[in-house]
Structure formats: structure tokens, C-alpha cells
From Swiss-Prot:
Keywords: Cytoplasm, Schiff base, Thiamine biosynthesis, Transferase. The gene is thiG. Pfam families: ThiG. It comes from the Bacteria. GO terms for cellular component: cytoplasm. GO terms for biological process: thiamine diphosphate biosynthetic process. Catalyzes the rearrangement of 1-deoxy-D-xylulose 5-phosphate (DXP) to produce the thiazole phosphate moiety of thiamine. Sulfur is provided by the thiocarboxylate moiety of the carrier protein ThiS. In vitro, sulfur can be provided by H(2)S. Coiled coil: none annotated. It comes from Cupriavidus taiwanensis (strain DSM 17343 / BCRC 17206 / CCUG 44338 / CIP 107171 / LMG 19424 / R1). InterPro entries: Aldolase_TIM, Thiazole_synthase_ThiG, ThiG. This is Thiazole synthase. The active site is at residue 109.
């Protein structure tokens, strides 16, 4: 049975003026085998697949790198190169330029790492690097934290979409600072926000979509699952369900109980109320 997310039919996912039929982006690293990766992509039908030029060796001289790249092209899914493993502005720019030439795309997921233990982005230098890439004609999707001031600065330099983390890369903890993430969504209502790191379960993805986030990017949660293909499919369904729930308008939370079944019209309801007042 094919799962058809109805929410995407009503509100297309738009990044830099381009529409996508899915709100899930999928990484291509750490899968048990290329065949598993291929099946996971087919099962989840992502909007894009991300590729780390520095780590995958997609342009290496070896046959393995060329075979990997040919397999990705055969999937017929847009490629989003990233600058994973870059710790300086120059490394980012050099990697981005190479990726644009190799993958023949202006898209780039900007990763500028500031700490090699937490893999937290270099928030001080990130806006300047993003601005440089934008001036070079890239469509930049910056990996950032949920810090509102940083995100506004990235928008100021010209980014049209942001990729805040939910938790450090690869931790699978879900949203560790839900208050800040919800504030970010509320304060930037018109900006596409894609949760980029820290999700481990489909329920984590559904949760952030329910908050109004526009999409998620996954890698380790799928690649390191016991059954990656099934997990990829589960995440795709969770993303669609979360977005549909957001569009449906969830009921407000309440501090006290409220009966879901009305008592007006039920036998003795008036008599019971009279006795309670007596």
C-alpha cells in the first residue's frame, strides 16, 4: 500500500522558490550497504538527499566513489551537498565550490562546525560564511542552533530557509529545548524551518511538525536503525501525520479536566444540578 500524505497536496513545501512534494530530507551516510540506502530512499520518497563531499568521496578516483555517485543519480532525487567536517570559513567555501561543480547544483547545506565534541555550529562566524556563499550564487540552507538572534542574523544576510537542530547531531534525543524551538517558530512564522539534527524517533519528527516546523532532515535515525528501510518509511508517515495535524488545528491545552461528553439532555442532569446547589 502506498502512503499518500494529504497535507503536501494542500500546502507545497517551498524552498528558494522551488516546490517539493515531501517535507523529509534524508542523509546518505552510515547505512549498512548501498542497497539499503537505495531502498530507504525509495521507501521514504524524500524531497532531497544530502551528500557530504568530504566524507563520501563521491568524486574520488576509486571505483567505489564513482559507483556511489552513479547510484545516487539513478535515484532521481535532488541532491543537497553539505559541508560536513568543515571547521573554517575557507574549508566551507572550498568544499561548496567543489560540490557545486561535481553535483551540478547551486544547493548547499552549510555546516560550519565550532566544536568537534558537540558538533555545535560556529554561530559567531556562520552568518558571514552564509553571506559569502549567497553572493556566490548558492541556495544556502544553514545548519544552526535554535537561537533566535542567530537565526534572525542568518535571515538578514539573505538566507531564505534555516535548519536549526533539535539536539546535537547523532544523539537521537529529540527536542531538548522545546520552549526555544516553539518560540523560534512563533517569532519566524514565514520562514521555512527544517529541523536538522538530534531526532531519533518518528514521534520526534511528528512533534516538531505539529509545532509548525516545515520539515526534517534525518540520517543516523534511519541509517543506524535495526531495519533502516522500515524506519525510513515510518519517518515519512510521521512527517506527513505531523504536518496534517498542524494544519488541522490541534485543540488547546487546558489545566483542568473538561468532559468530552455533554450532560445537557441526559436523564436527571437538571435534578442532579439542583440537588448540588441545595
Amino acid at each position: 500500500m502506498t502512503f499518500e500524505p494529504s497535507a503536501t497536496l494542500r500546502d507545497p513545501f517551498v524552498l528558494y522558490g522551488e516546490s517539493f512534494g515531501s517535507r523529509l530530507l534524508l542523509g546518505t551516510a552510515r547505512y549498512p550497504s548501498p542497497a539499503t540506502l537505495e531502498a530507504a530512499v525509495q521507501a521514504s520518497a524524500p524531497a532531497m538527499i544530502t551528500v557530504a563531499l568530504r566524507r563520501q568521496g563521491a568524486v574520488g578516483d576509486g571505483e567505489g566513489g564513482q559507483a556511489f555517485w552513479q547510484m545516487l543519480k539513478a535515484l532521481n532525487v535532488p541532491v543537497l551537498p553539505n559541508t560536513a567536517g568543515c571547521f573554517t570559513a575557507q574549508e566551507v567555501i572550498t568544499t561548496a565550490m567543489m560540490a557545486r561543480e561535481v553535483f551540478e547544483t547551486p544547493w548547499i547545506k552549510l555546516e560550519l562546525i565550532g566544536d568537534d565534541y558537540t558538533l555545535q555550529p560556529d554561530t559567531l562566524n556562520l552568518p558571514a560564511v552564509a553571506e559569502t556563499l549567497l553572493k556566490e550564487g548558492f541556495k544556502v540552507l544553514p545548519y544552526c542552533t535554535e537561537d533566535l538572534v542567530l537565526c534572525r542574523r542568518l535571515l538578514d544576510v539573505g538566507c531564505q530557509a534555516l535548519m536549526p537542530w533539535a539536539a546535537p547531531i547523532g544523539t537521537g534525543r529529540g527536542a531538548v529545548n522545546p520552549h526555544a524551538m516553539r518560540v523560534l517558530r512563533e517569532r519566524l512564522p514565514d520562514t521555512p524551518l527544517i529541523v536538522d539534527a538530534g531526532l531519533g524517533l518518528p514521534s520526534h519528527a511528528a512533534q516538531v511538525l505539529e509545532w509548525g516546523y516545515d520539515g526534517v532532515l534525518l540520517n543516523t535515525a534511519v541509517a543506524q536503525a535495526a531495519y533502516p528501510v522500515d524506519m525510513a518509511r515510518a519517518f515519512a508517515q510521521a512527517v506527513a501525520a505531523g504536518r496534517t495535524a498542524y494544519l488541522a488545528g490541534p485543540m488547546p491545552e487546558r489545566e483542568v479536566a473538561q468532559a468530552s461528553t455533554p450532560v445537557v439532555g441526559m436523564p436527571f442532569w437538571h435534578a442532579d444540578n439542583t440537588e448540588q446547589r441545595a
